Amino acid sequence: MGITVDVAYKSLNKYTEILCGDKVELLQTEDSNIMILADGMGSGVKANILSTLTSKILGTMFLNGATLEECVDTISETLPICQVRQVAYSTFSILQVYHNGDAYLVEYDNPGCIFVRDGKLMEIPQNVREIQGKKINEYRFKVQKGDALILMSDGTIHAGVGELLNFGWLWQDIAD
């Protein structure tokens, strides 16, 4: 049968917000599982709209065979521009795990994926690409039974800034 994927996720709303600014999409193809995490700029309703649009666009286009360049271009052209910040912005991560053990990971402005094998933190070989002026991290690697891959939005590493955790929650601390 090959590699199977167990997926779990948790989204927490920012304090006092009704909607979460993060969105997760889970998709399946005949030979793979696809996980998409998007985080809209800001918080609440605006962030939720940006992340929902981003995750839905990426999911639909990815399933229909669009290239990464086409996906990034469509997101750039589609997201509504914030009247205050004058940008349209959402971070995203796409993780596709094939049943044969091949994995494909794309990250744009989210903290790096945590990859654990046999209790040890693994480094994933990356290829940095620039698409429409955006630095996109792209990875191709192998996974095996028992591996754990953890995607997170920047809300994770910025949790508690200036309050409980003066400088947020460092990626290395989360990985450890």
What are these regions (language model features)?
Residues I3-D6, T29-S32, H99-D102, Q144-D147:
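Beta-strand-turn-beta hairpins that frame and shape the catalytic cleft
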